[in-house]
Amino acid sequence: MPTAYVLVLCDDNYPDYEIITQLNKLPCVLEVSKVDGPYDIVVKLSDNNMYMLKEAIGKHMVRIHRITSTLTLMPD
């Protein structure tokens, strides 16, 4: 099953928990974790359909306000 990890950078003036709540509502999301380091949140997504996975990242995630940047990692 295709899996993706998305590193999320958020607006510092906006509560992380609100973004985490919105991310948890997206299709294909399995886990959302707040982290320390250059990124604020790590999101794990998985789906049998690669198109649905890409759509969750490229269409739904980018619409969440206060996400300033993302980096998607897909293991081989």
Report the location of each language-model feature.
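A compositional/biophysical signature of low hydrophobicity enriched in polar/charged and small residues
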Residues: 1-76
